[in-house]
Amino acid sequence: MTRLTHLGSLPLAQDYPPCFDCVVEFADHLGGISLATERVDRRLAAVLAADVAGYSRLMGANEEDTLARLKAVRKILVDPAITSHRGRIVKTTGDGMLVEFASAVDAVRSAIEVQRSMAEQNAAVPQDQRIEFRIGIHVGDVIFDDNDIFGDGVNIAARLEGI
């Protein structure tokens, strides 16, 4: 078997040993991208991660009803609580969401408002049909990229939500 090492003047990844400096050099050959000097936007933020407890079970019992109720709860209770406390919904994932706040106090107040509203909403709903949110909040350094957030601050909030 022959091993190609070059296609014309374009170097192949196999021409470089696996090290960061070599990755930077290879990226420079491909298009002048300098990974070493690319700056990321980091900020301190309060990250709220939330999802619906027992969502798979609820969907298994009645998909259409669960989805309709979740959409209504988000529109009437959750989204307004986030907005009123200056939060920004970064993304939603089916039954979950990731929200960014500039203030930890605002994140906690928003979470308390959601939990209180949901408790009132669920008072007349049978236990096995309740939509209940698990919420985790963490303040930490996050990376902002294309209206999304990444990093340990996000990961820790998501882990806390699962507890």
Where do the protein language model's features map onto the residues?
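Cysteine-centered motifs
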Residues: 19-22
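Leucine-biased recognition of intrinsically disordered, low-complexity hydrophobic segments
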Residues: 4-12, 30, 35
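Catalytic NTP-binding/metal-coordinating core of nucleotidyl cyclase/transferase enzymes
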Residues: 31-117
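Acidic, metal-dependent phosphodiester-chemistry machinery of nucleic-acid enzymes
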Residues: 15
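Catalytic beta-strand-to-alpha-helix segment of the class III nucleotidyl cyclase homology domain
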Residues: 37-38, 79, 98-163
